[in-house]
């Protein structure tokens, strides 16, 4: 296991640091980068850590009392799964604290997003397709134990990213906001009356599984016609693969080879930038279905803003967001759709660690389990 650690101050030396804890024999790479601007939602008592847990990497960051990121540490998630991933999360926090010049005991709270359904109250991850051996993982308890009893807050990763955008990104000052994150799937989160809405059993915001076409394309959950079956990267590349099988030609085969299911969001963006008509038509179809979903949500909740984030949106950029917004504005019942602001995520890759730090702050004052 190798951890890359970064000091977010101009005083970083650039020298390698040895790890401590479970990563005592690992290599660390330290360099100076610009600090994150302070934000009120990130400010609080003492230092906190935010963890962005993904299927391929674990990123941890330390936030100062004024909300500035002072250090980061990154480690691969690995293929072992189970408790090994929890060890890696703890090691990343420990190293980020060390690089910041802190003892682990000086970290007051830790927050983490998890790419899976999770109960924030019990702290149990029920299952995750990206991490083996995490069925009913008591993450809150296990991570806290490995960090010497530091309080831990956990939540779904997209919900955490939406919290970040509301507290320190595109949605600052917005009372009612929806976040939609198209990526491998389509995740979402709801901010109602200034607070994240979790529902009766903590699963509110599963926007990817609203039905937009009865009996439509199969979804990974087993249903049909869900938003995720039309607007995720997985759905986009499946549609492109079908068109190629039917005889359509696309530059994407030159970029990724004949196995189009390997295409990343950046590959789709590259093909679109080259004017690939097949890719552009599928992305236009994606924007159309996403607009249908957004209009339905707008009619139900009447939010002020929809923030679009995730790998697909980050790769395709403002043109895609504007295409979606244009299609939303022409949907029926214009009272909810025309005034709706539709914007891209402002925090990008930092949304995960930022939202995780915010839920740690909220836990400190009793606003998050």
Where are these regions (language model features)?
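Short hydrophobic alpha-helix segments
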Residues: 73-75, 129, 200
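Short beta-strand segments
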Residues: 52, 111-115, 155, 178-185, ...
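ATP-binding/phosphotransfer module of carbohydrate and carboxylate kinases, centering on a glycine-rich
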Residues: 1-109, 118-124, 143-151, 164-174, ...
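A glycine-rich, Thr/Ser-enriched phosphate-binding loop motif common to dinucleotide/cofactor-binding enzymes
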Residues: 154-163
